Amino acid sequence: MFDHRILEILVCPLTKDKLQYNKDTNELISEKAKLAFPIRDGIPIMLIDEARKLEE
C-alpha cells in the first residue's frame, strides 16, 4: 500500500518538480521529465535508470 503523504516531500530527481501517483500502474509520474518511477513493496524507486519513459 502506498502512503500518499510521501508526495508532499518527494520530487522528481531530474526536474525537482512534484510527482503524481498513478494507481493503475503503481508508479510516481513526473509529467515534466516524462518519467514513471516504480513503487516496489510500497517503496518508491527514485532512480532515473529505473524509471520508465512515458510516451509522448
From Swiss-Prot:
Lineage: Bacteria, Pseudomonadati, Pseudomonadota, Alphaproteobacteria, Rickettsiales
Family listed: Belongs to the UPF0434 family.
Protein name according to UniProt: UPF0434 protein ECH_0194
Superkingdom of origin organism: Bacteria
Protein's organism: Ehrlichia chaffeensis (strain ATCC CRL-10679 / Arkansas)
InterPro entries in alphabetical order: Trm112-like (IPR005651)
Coiled-coil residue windows: none
Pfam families: Trm112p
Signal sequence region: none
A GO-annotated cellular component: cytosol
